């Protein structure tokens, strides 16, 4: 049987002896019954410390004026001890269940502060935290799918509008490329599937861009960034599609001016390898044209806007410089000549060969025909 420390009193004698406090004050502690009670209390304290540490703190103190016998005193002490254990265990359980609630309230208050763009409120434990919002200075890119298999990457400009960064033509539009099947392209009597695959894929991509240039410019509010650097040729992607990166001033695009281009420009310039009817041979041949616009006068090229109409067609003519090379020349009202385009026959020139020839003979053509 365990007794409560606060309830432990010296047992009253039959003749109305003094209490334990009175004995301590007078120094009267030496009777056998008192020593036995002290030993019993010491052993009980050890058991309480091991089994139910802290239970005695919740025990109610007993009044010192009430006289009880030994059995009643021990019974009351046991009941108080059991009650203290139960109360202590209940208190510990309540503390465990209330901790998540307190933590939940703290997190909820922090989330409310974040959502309202305020500082994090002071937590219940006294800690404070601050949230720093950093502005994103990186270039924002986004991709738009204009048609199935045609993906255009735009860059949002700080002053408004979008800059066209990349056009990608996925090979899913042409299932034969994706499956890596043979593409029959006759070059003489020899078939070159790999070379023909690259040429035909670029031809499809360039044709689509010439036809849909104005629609993309108007629909996506494209305003080219002056710092963009164009590439010479649109590279072929890993999946068989072609990419046109930084299409500003690229040979595949119509001439870009500060004003919006006219409707008839796609047919008049650009590296458009669409089938054309040659005015020299009179037969339908696939030709690739390079915009070789160059004027002998000192007029700025950016201020020149070429519009194809009936009067322009009357002042233009075609000359054959070499077999398979056709040069279109136009006479200007001021008496000067303008080199409109140079066309190469597909039967004799590939794209790389045509560009190399033009770089080597550009000065000669301008001096000879202009």
UniProtKB/Swiss-Prot annotation:
Region (Disordered) residue ranges read: 231-316
Q: Is Repeat tagged as a keyword?
A: yes
Which residues belong to any copy of the BRX domain? Answer: 140-221, 315-370
Q: Where is the composition biased (Polar residues)?
A: 231-248, 266-291
In which tissues is this gene expressed?
A: Expressed in roots.
Task: Decide whether keyword Transport is in the record.
Answer: no
UniProt keyword terms in alphabetical order: Nucleus, Repeat
**UniProt-listed InterPro entries:** Brevis_radix_dom, BRX-like, BRX_N
Question: Mind telling me which PANTHER family this protein's record contains?
Answer: PROTEIN BREVIS RADIX-LIKE 1, PROTEIN BREVIS RADIX-LIKE 3
| Protein name as it appears in the record | Protein Brevis radix-like 3
Give the organism, scientific name: Arabidopsis thaliana (Mouse-ear cress)
């Amino acid at each position: 049987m365990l007794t409560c420390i606060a309830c432990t009193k010296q047992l009253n004698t039959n003749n109305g002896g003094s209490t334990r406090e009175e004995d301590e004050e007078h120094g009267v502690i030496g009777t056998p019954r008192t020593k036995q009670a002290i030993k019993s209390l010491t052993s009980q304290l050890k058991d309480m410390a091991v089994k139910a540490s802290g239970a005695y703190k919740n025990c109610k103190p007993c009044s010192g004026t009430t006289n009880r016998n030994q059995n009643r005193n021990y019974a009351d002490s046991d009941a108080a001890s059991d009650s203290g254990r139960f109360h202590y265990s209940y208190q510990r359980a309540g503390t465990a269940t209330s901790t998540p609630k307190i933590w939940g309230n703290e997190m909820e208050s922090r989330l409310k502060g974040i959502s309202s763009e305020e500082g994090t409120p002071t937590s219940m434990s006294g800690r404070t935290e601050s949230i720093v919002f950093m502005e994103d200075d990186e270039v924002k890119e986004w991709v738009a799918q204009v048609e199935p298999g045609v993906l255009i990457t735009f860059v949002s400009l700080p002053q408004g509008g979008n800059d066209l960064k990349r056009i990608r033509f996925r090979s899913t539009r042409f299932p034969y490329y994706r499956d890596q099947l043979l593409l029959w392209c006759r070059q003489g009597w020899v078939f070159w599937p790999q070379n023909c695959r690259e040429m035909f894929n670029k031809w499809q991509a360039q044709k689509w861009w010439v036809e849909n240039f104005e629609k993309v410019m108007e629909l996506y509010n494209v305003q080219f960034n002056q710092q963009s650097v164009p590439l010479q040729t649109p590279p072929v992607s890993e999946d068989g599609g072609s990419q046109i990166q930084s299409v500003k001033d690229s040979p595949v695009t119509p001439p870009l001016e500060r004003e919006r281009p006219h409707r008839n420009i796609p047919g008049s310039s650009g590296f458009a390898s669409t089938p054309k009817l040659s005015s020299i041979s009179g037969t339908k041949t696939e030709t690739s044209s390079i915009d070789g616009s160059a004027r002998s006068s000192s007029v700025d090229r950016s201020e020149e806007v070429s519009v194809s109409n009936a009067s322009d067609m009357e002042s233009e003519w075609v000359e054959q410089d070499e077999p398979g090379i056709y040069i279109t020349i136009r006479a200007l009202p001021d008496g000067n000549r303008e080199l409109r385009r140079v066309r190469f026959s597909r039967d004799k020139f590939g794209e790389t060969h045509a560009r190399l020839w033009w770089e080597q003979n550009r000065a000669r053509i301008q001096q000879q025909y202009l």
